[in-house]
A protein has these predicted regions:
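Nucleotide donor/acceptor-binding cores
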Residues: 2-4, 89
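Short glycine/serine/threonine-rich phosphate/pyrophosphate-binding segments
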Residues: 14-19, 74-77, 101-102, 125-128
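ADP-ribose/adenylate-binding Rossmann-like module
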Residues: 72, 78-101
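Rossmann-fold dehydrogenase core element
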Residues: 87-90, 105-122, 140-145
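Rossmann-fold NAD(P)-binding glycine/threonine-rich loop
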Residues: 94-116, 126-134
Length: 206
């Protein structure tokens, strides 16, 4: 059986390192390419028996599927490279923290490409999304909704993609859509009726 060649974009990130370990457990997968930020000290060195590089074109050409857990700018650069390539490499991306303009550009670049995007791919979170949707349908008209989330101290985006996904699940279940509200500093303002308020904590290795 032909093995699926897997390229990892961001192999030295928390998720990248975890994926490297998991690939060993699947005989049908073959680690084929590792691409990291050109300024990272790992570039030019071996990781899991493969020389780490910073060439997006090389990553695309050496992979059947690219797994991407980087930052928005890097993900957009990857998609731009894919659009130039004749090789129809698929991408699984869990990158979060897109601004509205970046998200618009991301969606435009995705057209015609094989892209799977999720802000959180765990089974538990996807079950939770369905529970939140159903709960919101029952109680949200009478309730104030807040989302409190905590992540490790290396997490860049606030609120997290998972928190935003749960807010989307709330809005899938309600009749009157709620607006996301970010309280980044202390204010004397009262919360509004139809809003979802986020609070975020970053610390340790959660």
């Amino acid at each position: 059986m032909k093995k699926i060649k897997i390229g990892i974009f961001g192999p030295k990130g928390r998720m990248g390192e975890s994926i490297l370990e998991q690939i060993k457990n699947f005989s049908e997968l073959k680690l084929s390419s590792l691409c990291e930020n050109k300024k990272h000290s790992i570039v030019g060195k071996e990781l899991a028996g493969i020389l780490v590089h910073s060439d997006l074109k090389k990553l695309v050409n050496e992979s059947d599927v690219i797994i991407d857990f980087t930052i928005p700018e890097a993900t957009i650069n990857l998609l731009e490279e894919l659009r130039k390539s004749k090789k129809k490499t698929a991408v699984v991306t869990g990158t979060t923290g897109f601004t509205k303009s970046q998200e618009k550009k991301f969606l435009k670049l995705c057209k015609g490409l094989k892209i799977l995007q999720s802000f959180n791919m765990s089974l538990g979170i996807n079950i939770l999304k369905e529970l939140v949707k159903k709960t919101a349908k029952i109680i949200s008209e009478e309730s104030d909704i807040e989302i409190s989330e905590i992540h490790h101290n290396m997490k860049r985006d606030v609120p997290s993609g998972t928190a935003l996904t749960l807010a989307d699940s709330v809005n899938e279940g309600v009749k009157v859509k709620k607006k996301n509200s970010y309280r980044l500093q202390s204010t004397n303002l009262l919360r509004k009726k139809n809003e979802i308020v986020f609070s975020s904590v970053r610390g340790g290795d959660v």
